[in-house]
Curated annotation (Swiss-Prot):
Function: J region of the variable domain of T cell receptor (TR) alpha chain that participates in the antigen recognition. Alpha-beta T cell receptors are antigen specific receptors which are essential to the immune response and are present on the cell surface of T lymphocytes. Recognize peptide-major histocompatibility (MH) (pMH) complexes that are displayed by antigen presenting cells (APC), a prerequisite for efficient T cell adaptive immunity against pathogens.
UniProt keyword Oxidoreductase present: no
Subcellular location: Cell membrane
Key words of the record: Adaptive immunity, Cell membrane, Immunity, Membrane, Receptor, T cell receptor
Cellular-component GO terms for this entry: T cell receptor complex
Name of the protein in its database record: T cell receptor alpha joining 3
Gene name as annotated: TRAJ3
Transmembrane annotation, as ranges: none
Length: 20
């Protein structure tokens, strides 16, 4: 769900891309 958004908001959020 927020995976794609986390990449934009949080640069390190790319790791969270595995999340729904």
């Amino acid at each position: 769900g927020y995976s794609s958004a986390s990449k934009i908001i949080f640069g390190s959020g790319t790791r969270l891309s595995i999340r729904p």
